[in-house]
Structure formats: structure tokens, C-alpha cells
Amino acid sequence: MVYKMVVTPYLFKEIIAIFQNTSDYIIALETLLLLSVMWIIFHKRDGRSFYISGDKEITVNYEPENLMDIAVPQHSFLKTHLIRSKVGKNVSVDDYYCLNLATHNYLGLLEDKQILENACRCIRKYGVGSCGPRGFYGTMDVHLKLEERLASFMKVEDSVVYSYGFSTISSAIPAYSKRGDIIFVDEAVNFAIQKGLDASRSTVYFYKHNDIADLERLLREQAKRDDKRAEIDLIAAAMEWTVGAIGGFCVGSHFIVEHQRLSGLGYCFSASLPPLLAESAISSLKRLDSEPQIFMELREISILMNSKFSTFSKLKLGGNKLSPVKHLYISENRDNREVEHELLNKVCGECISRGIAIVQACYLYKIEGNPIRPSIRITANRLLTVFEIDYAFKIIEDVSNEIL
């Protein structure tokens, strides 16, 4: 038998040749790696022994950090109000029967008996929930009827319904606008739009509030940088202020709506609108079609309230005269926002005790961009009478003069 063995001198020559052909950097790196592995393998860690007495001492001295900031006992958010009735034209707040100027019910449809009966009938048929998102067993026939009705009412091709008004616009914006796109936005847009802009990661240019000239300036500057593109039309709105339901919708061309059904986060991943609310919205739209004069009734009430409330002694009225939402600011601008907030909170509380339900407008001052001054929010309702508006004015005027 013949054995073939590697000659030792030849082996050493091969190793030397490898080192000669390898750069100094590689040799140093591999040497450092080898030393590190050897240190990890052979290094002995100092064992730490724990005793029961030591564990008890650690447990006794342990002071966990607060999960959230400590609340100030005097904070206005801790002084909640208890509602004991349906929130309609009148409402019971903390056992005070009040004329409601606080909540959004512009057309007064929350108290419509026919809409209530239709909602109750829908509960008996479908129950109170829809059991999932629209793409996962959450679509009922009433959802499709509502979308068809909305498209017809708005005179567009198609519509898509969301289960929550806030998620409507905050989902619609990132569905169409991505990184690299440009959006021009009013600097005073609401928080839902702000969240949609953040989610889109687009380049955002803010123009001055309600200043069309400033918007035109930004568009002209952008036109110099870009070629003209086709117009895309999308209308988004919430149903929570007018039609006596909850949710929101987007309407536009069929192409626009279909894209949102695939890309709208609130549509794809949130539970769909409860069928009873979809039925309520359908009934409200039928009412709006059959009685268009209720819009004119609301318009007249809004103008009347604007005319009356603009004469407060120590409060300044803000908002368009045709808008059903009014804001009352302290006439003398205080430098401290907290002081204004506390004073207006006292005004609201005293007005409730005298039979007028009003609230402060709420903002997330640490999160929202360009937050507005503290104010009292007043909402119009077409069911209000001239006597009730005069009575509300007198109470608010008396209370503001006493506190401010």
C-alpha cells in the first residue's frame, strides 16, 4: 500500500505565499477577529450572587416612573358634564334643562321621528354591528344603497362611505398623494386633514387662511416648475354634523372611488358603518331631496344668530354669517392662553346652570399646527326660534359681563 503525504516544507511555503499575497488590512482585521473570538470563549465573567435580603431591599426601594403626566386637579377636562337626555334642540346637562347651542345638529334631523323609526327597523333586521371591514364581510345592502344615494345627491358618478368622519379625509389624502407629490393647504385646516397630510409624506405648502390671492401666488410659482396636469376632483365630507348619522364619504369619478376602495386605510381596515346608521343617512338624504327648503331655514337662522351675537359687549364673534358654526372670543386679547381658557370655561359652566348649553372649542395645542385662540363654539339649529335666540343672547351677555 502506498501512502501519499503532504511534505511539511511545501505546506509552510503555501502558508507564507498566502500571507504575502494578502493585504495588511485583511490580515489585521482577521487577527483582530480571531483575538475577539478567543476572548469571548475563554473570558470568565464575574458571577454576581443575589441574596433574598438584597432582593427585598431592591423591591422596597423601587420607584416606577409615571406612565403619563400627573393631572392637575383643577384641569377643566376633569370637570365633565353628565348628559341625561337625547342630544337634540334641548338637552339635559347636569340636571339642567338647556337650550342646546353646543352640538352639531344643524338641520334638526336627530329628532325626526321617521328617521328614528327607520333606524329601529334596521336594527331588527341587521342588529347593531356589521361584523367587519367593507372588504371582509362588512358590506351590507344598505351600504351600497347609501353610496348610490350619495352619488345621486351630489350629482357625481360614484361614492365611498367610511364608518367615521375623522378617518374619511385622513384616509383619502394618503390614498392619492405620496412622497414626492405636492399639496397646497389652508393653514387653518382641521386636525383630521393635518393627520392625512402627515400620513401622505408629501411636500405641503400652506397658504394664509381664506386668502385666495396667497394660494394663487403659490400655484403660479409651482406652475413655473411643473407642466400642467389633468384635474382630479374629489369631495370629502363627514355625515356627523347634518344627516343625523355617523361616518363620512368621498364622491367623485368612478376611477377615483375605486382607487380609494383599494387604498383608503380607514375603508380597508376599519369596521364598516353600522347598518342602522347607514339607513338613517339614507332617510335623511330622502328628506333633504323632498324638503330642500330646510337649507334656507338654516341659512336664515345662521344669519339671524350672526347679526344678534355680533353685539356682545365683552365677546367678539368670529365666523362667516352663513356658517352654522360661530366662535366667540374674548374681546380683549389676553397674553396667556390658559387664562382665556379658564375664563371661557367658567362662562360655559355658568350658562349651563342658567339653561343655555354651550361648550369651548377643543384643540390639541401641543400637536395641531397653527392652533386657534380659545373660544366658545356656538352652533345653529334650524328649529331655533327668534325668542330662543334672544334668550340665549341675554344669558350669554349677562354671564360674560359678570365673569369677564
Tell what function each PLM region has.
Residues Y3, T8, I18-L35, W39, ...:
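PLP-dependent enzyme catalytic core of the Aspartate aminotransferase-like
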Residues Y3-V128:
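N-terminal "arm"/small-domain region of PLP-dependent enzymes with the aminotransferase-like
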Residues D69-Q74, K79-T80, L109, I294-N306, ...:
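Conserved PLP-binding catalytic core of the aspartate aminotransferase-like
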Residues N105, S202-A230:
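Active-site phosphate-binding strand-loop segment of PLP-dependent enzymes
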Residues E117-Y164:
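Conserved N-terminal alpha-helix of the aminotransferase class I/II PLP-enzyme fold
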Residues A172-F191:
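Conserved PLP-anchoring active-site segment centered on the Schiff-base-forming lysine
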Residues R179, A199-R201, S313:
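Short, structured coil segments at secondary-structure junctions
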Residues K228-L322, L328, R334:
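Active-site C-terminal subdomain of aminotransferase-like
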